[in-house]
Amino acid sequence: MTRIRVHTAIAISFVFALGCAAQAPATTEVHSRNGGGTLVLPTSVARLVHQEVNRVRAEHRLRPLAWDGRLGGVATNHSRDMLRRGYFAHNSPTGEDFSARYERGGYTCQVPLSSRSFLTGGENLALTHHNARIIVYADGRKVPAGFRTPAQVAQRVVDGWLHSPGHRANLLKPQWRQEGIGVAIGADGRIWVTQNFC
């Protein structure tokens, strides 16, 4: 049987142009308040990203993805690791990729493609800031951020994935049945989002 790993190599980074100082990430995850006082919780952003993903999939006549708590744990651990060690990539500084993280988390994914092949998982990443004034997408588009609430953060994350061909293909892959979303928020307001599929 052929194993096919879906690995979107181009990680999407929402770059913050105005009013955002470059700071090292905090070493612990925080719950952040934006300038207007809205509390941004990692779990609420994860839930809202999941809802937004399923809204978009429904628009494309695709089945919704079930929430998988174990896969969410794998995703959360990766987001927290990126925050803690100050990187943004599918592979950790030690070379661990999403399939190794699945294995370490005790998660096995085998989504049939045919009688002879299957997918073993997939991953999308996003890095954004809930106080950003301008977002620069991977495709070069610059748009006013204008988001303050967790729902607006979730919408911007999913919109960013939809404007990146590899991330879009992952998000709209009809074979996926479930996903886990993991979110970590740094003291500087940066938000790391990992989306893992099976």
Give residue ranges: language-model regions.
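Bacterial N-terminal signal peptides that target proteins for export
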Residues: 1-10
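Short, low-complexity, Pro/Ser/Thr/Gly-rich segments in the mature regions of secreted, periplasmic
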Residues: 188-198
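A well-ordered secondary-structure block
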Residues: 98-187
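Bacterial N-terminal signal peptides
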Residues: 9-19
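Bacterial Sec signal peptide processing site at the extreme N-terminus
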Residues: 21-31
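Short, well-ordered surface patches within globular domains
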Residues: 29, 40-109, 168, 174-180, ...
